Amino acid sequence: VESDWSSASYFFSIAALSNSATLTLSTFFKDSLQGDSKLVDIYKIFGIETKFEEDHIILRKNKIDLPKSINLNLKDSPDLAQTIIITCLGLGVDCTLNGLHTLKIKETDRLIALKNEIEKFNVDKVEITKNSITLENNSDLKHEVIIETYNDHRMAMSFAPLSLLVPIIINDPEVVSKSYVNFWKDLESLGFNILKINR
């Protein structure tokens, strides 16, 4: 049984936001039927090379010149939107993501949630329509932003890789258990420093 490509997306983001990275992810196949497998092509934009082995993939970060902006239609893989826009936020790449009308009817209205949380980082602009989101970056990310997760597992997991660049605080981190119980343990195994805050 193939693993879930949308769960793999957070590790593509980690690789993209790292100075250098080689990550191995188990049970992914080249001829996947999952729409979210288009991650492989999308993350080439950010310098991530994906090598397919017999039953796993190896992600490698290559140094490349990043584009100033990207425009993607994600109508067949809308669950990747949160991860991709946070990758763009971290890399300083402006982006417009289209085909996102279904994100308004997920665990939360993900477009509004993304706009609310990304704006906390002092970006120049975040605009949403009924099926798109546009980000215009600023050069300096604000530190120790508190991320609300809106009872949405993907909000917690998509913002987590940003902690490679700036310290962040994620409220209700247990929400990841909806789809990926060991997410925080897996990040710790990669060297992430995760502290529980009693507030």
Locate each region found by the language model.
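Short, structured segments at the rim of ligand-binding sites
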Residues: 1-199
